[in-house]
Each structure stands twice: as C-alpha cells, then as structure tokens.
Amino acid sequence: MEQEVRKKQMKKQQTLVLIKPDGLVKALTGNIITELSDTRLIIAGAKIVQVTRELAEEHYQHLREEKFFDELIKYIMGEFHVKRVLALVYHGDDAIKKVRGVVGSTNPEKAEHTTIRGKYGRITSEGVFENVVHASENEKEAEREIKLWFRPEELATTIYPTESKEVKKLEYFWKK
C-alpha cells in the first residue's frame, strides 16, 4: 500500500544529460553511463554532437552576462579538449532529481566525492569548471534543452507533443 502511494507521487519526467568534451577525452563515457544506469531510467535518445557556437550560446543563454561566458562557450565547443559532446535524454519517474543526485554539484570541489562530478571533475588553474557532465536543473529547463539538442524523431519515445509538416520530406517539429 505504502509503495503504491509513493509510486503515484512520482512524476514521469525527462532530462538532458551532456557528457562534455573533458568527459569524452578522459574516456569516462562508460563509467558515467554505468553510474546513470543505476537510476533505472530509460535512455530515450543519444547522439554525438559537434557543438556550434550558436548551439552553445543558446544552451547557456541564462549565463550570457557572466564573466566566464566566453570560456564556457569555448569549453562546451571543445576548444580545450575534443570537439564533440555526447547528448542523452533520460526518461522515467523523478528523472531530474535522480540524475542530479548521481551527477552532483556544478562545482566539482563542492560535489560529494561519490558523485560523477566529485569523482571526475576539476577546476583548472584558469578557474574553468571541468565538471564532465551537464544535467537539466528543472522541468522547464529540461524541455527547453531537449528541444534544443534533439529533433522529435531522434527520440525513441514521444515525450512532448509534435506535429508533422510537409517540407521536402516528412519532418516533425515541436508544438509551440
């Protein structure tokens, strides 16, 4: 009975996870995915992305006024490591909370040592957080980020409403 009530309180969510260039160059992809799999969430989408300046700036638009913005853009674009990111969408009960718990604090020095960022992240001598992964902070951010990084047909499950439009071929677009 208690388990049924708890299950009803859980909310199906999706969240974006990026394994950043420093995570890829350090060959941490397998370790990170293994740790994320402990959440028992479903991978709804996965792809390797070469991050453009436009994508990076749109992703980090909320940090545009920060003094570290330019370094952050260079970092996610792979100018310090490799020029690619592994983008993943996880789906399931309380996905955001579960993933954020495994990932840890944005600042690797403040992250619990058992979390991904606590184990593998660092702060460079220039003050750049090489925190290995990104994870959406809340539902609104998750939706915005997933729609930014993935087209509907790239996801194995429909998580947001879409509509089809006739272009050169049948394509799907996120509903506004």
Where are these regions (language model features)?
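Non-catalytic terminal and connector segments of soluble metabolic enzymes
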Residues: 2-176
